């Protein structure tokens, strides 16, 4: 599990794309020229950006070779670059940096966010959406199973928090619009929840385990999910999924 699995990731494409659509709707920019899609994945968000600004020069950035290959296949006329978000440098100032469900994987947001703002043109916008589910049962149980089975902690860090991001970006010279939304996804089974998180949040926990260790982990994880997520009257499961949204406009 050294690289992302585009097919597994796309299994819930509609649910994953909805936050990108809603983030994009809050970006009030017109006639812009340079856009970067950070953590572009399979190119779903890049396609949305092209629809909104067809004349703009858009660059999709992702560190996953598999994701970049999928994006290039889906959008052959677009520019995609395999690179680390932290190290990538654009050739010109950017009018929009769009980062949908990517920056949560990177550490040191107190340094990362001001760095990204520095890449913007005057009045440019940094638009960010990050899953804020570190305290949700899906992610708490990952840590509990790992502790039970004596596996090292592989999970990502929790987000800095609403007030911290507001201060970070305000001090970086931005006007900040920040909000948090909880989606309730209808899941047909507990296995469907596992399928969802295996493509994203569960990846770091499984990547260094043998096949038998992975199966042992997932069996116990499934048992614990059944305890935490009861069935609705119609047999569905409601999976709460909080997400943090930020639209920061550079004022300098």
From Swiss-Prot:
UniProt GO BP: methylation
Pfam families attached to this UniProt entry: Methyltransf_25
Compartments it resides in: Cytoplasm
Predominant cellular place of this UniProt entry's protein: cytoplasm
Keywords from the named record: Cytoplasm, Methyltransferase, S-adenosyl-L-methionine, Transferase
Keyword Transferase appears in the UniProt entry: yes
Record-level GO cellular component terms: cytoplasm
CDD domains in alphabetical order: AdoMet_MTases
Keyword DNA-binding: no
Catalytic activity: trans-aconitate + S-adenosyl-L-methionine = (E)-3-(methoxycarbonyl)pent-2-enedioate + S-adenosyl-L-homocysteine
SUPFAM superfamilies membership: S-adenosyl-L-methionine-dependent methyltransferases (SSF53335)
EC number in record: 2.1.1.144
GO molecular function: trans-aconitate 2-methyltransferase activity
Family according to the record: Belongs to the methyltransferase superfamily. Tam family.
Known function: Catalyzes the S-adenosylmethionine monomethyl esterification of trans-aconitate.
HAMAP family: Tran_acon_Me_trans (MF_00560)
PANTHER family assigned to the protein according to its UniProt record, in alphabetical order: TRANS-ACONITATE 2-METHYLTRANSFERASE, TRANS-ACONITATE 2-METHYLTRANSFERASE-RELATED
Protein name: Trans-aconitate 2-methyltransferase
Species of provenance: Escherichia coli O1:K1 / APEC
């Amino acid at each position: 599990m050294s690289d992302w699995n585009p097919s597994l990731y796309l299994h819930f494409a509609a649910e994953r794309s909805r936050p990108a659509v809603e983030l994009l709707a809050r970006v009030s920019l017109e006639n812009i020229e340079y856009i970067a899609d950070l953590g572009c994945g399979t190119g779903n968000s890049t396609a949305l950006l092209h629809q909104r600004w067809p004349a703009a020069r858009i660059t999709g950035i992702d560190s996953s070779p598999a994701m970049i290959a999928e994006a290039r296949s889906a959008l052959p006329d677009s520019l995609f670059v395999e690179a680390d978000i932290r190290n990538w440098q654009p050739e010109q100032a950017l009018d929009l940096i769009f980062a949908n469900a990517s920056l949560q994987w990177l550490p040191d947001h107190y340094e990362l966010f001001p760095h990204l703002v520095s890449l913007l043109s005057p009045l440019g916008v940094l638009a960010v959406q990050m899953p804020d589910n570190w305290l949700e049962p899906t992610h708490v149980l990952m840590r509990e199973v790992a502790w039970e089975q004596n596996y090292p902690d592989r999970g990502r860090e929790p987000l800095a928090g609403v007030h911290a991001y507001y201060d970070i970006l305000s001090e970086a010279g931005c006007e900040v619009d920040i909000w948090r939304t909880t989606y309730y996804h209808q899941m047909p089974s507990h296995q469907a929840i596992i399928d969802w998180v295996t493509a994203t949040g569960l990846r770091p926990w499984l990547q260094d385990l043998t096949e038998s260790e992975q199966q042992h982990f997932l069996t116990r994880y499934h048992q614990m999910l059944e305890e935490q997520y009861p069935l609705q009257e119609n047999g569905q499961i409601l999976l709460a999924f909080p997400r943090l949204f930020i639209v920061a406009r550079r004022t300098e």
